Regions:
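Acidic donor-binding segment of Leloir-type glycosyltransferases
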Residues: 24-55
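Short beta-strand-to-loop acidic/aromatic patch adjacent to the donor-nucleotide binding site
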Residues: 77-88
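Conserved donor-nucleotide/metal-binding helix-loop-beta segment in metal-dependent transferases, i.e.
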Residues: 92-114
Length: 207
């Protein structure tokens, strides 16, 4: 079982360092490949040890950066752990558990980690699960939904990278048209499994 860790950054080096530190502590898995896609548009940026660095010059935006990462995956990769540069983990992440659910159900496009409520609507509801609860169905150990393929921290099979990387809504539509659904790890009453720390984007960055 070969899993790639793919990290996307738009040049927010302070966030990225927090994300990588948290990943080193909480993603205890022997990744077969570690990619850092630098979409800052800078020729020189933060270069952590142990990562293959791919720099987009000029920058391509989020969807383009994801496509860059997908295009550089090794041919023998089975799964991708997707991580943007503004998330940290409050506790260790059980990646083999995520793999187990994906292998058991080929219709699952991803198992994601749910984050804390972020938007005003989410904060008022109390969690992402309570905002439109009819969209989420509890399964044994995971939560099923057909609403959105999320770019929040998640694991997906490499087959998903055969699609063209696009914004979440467009990629979701393409996957749903092929019968895929999406999942979150754990239970509806769990505490957040990842924390979004990105209160700002880099200047003039496009999604």
């Amino acid at each position: 079982m070969k899993i790639a860790l793919m990290v996307i950054t738009d040049g927010r080096w302070d966030y990225l360092q927090q994300t990588l530190q948290s990943a080193s502590e909480c993603l205890n898995y022997p990744f077969s490949q570690r990619l850092l896609v630098d979409d800052s548009g800078e020729s020189v940026g933060f270069a952590p040890d142990g990562f293959d660095i791919i720099r987009n010059l000029p920058r391509k935006g989020l969807a383009g950066a994801i496509q860059t990462g997908w295009d550089h995956l090794n041919d023998d990769i089975d799964f991708v752990f997707h991580l943007e540069d503004d998330f940290v983990f409050p506790e260790p992440v059980d990646i083999p558990w995520m793999v187990e659910y994906l292998e058991a159900d080929p219709s699952l496009a991803q198992i994601a980690l749910h984050r804390q409520p972020w938007s005003p609507e989410e904060r008022q509801a109390g969690s992402i699960y309570k905002l439109g609860p009819e969209r989420f169905t509890q399964r044994p150990g995971w939560i099923s939904q057909r609403h959105l393929f999320t770019f929040n921290p998640c694991l997906y099979p490499v087959e998903i990278t055969k699609y063209t990387a696009d914004l979440e809504a467009e990629l979701t539509a393409a996957l749903k048209s092929d019968g895929y659904r999406f999942g979150y790890l754990g239970n509806l009453d769990d505490e957040p499994r990842c924390l979004h720390i990105g209160v700002r984007r880099s200047k003039a960055y496009k999604l």
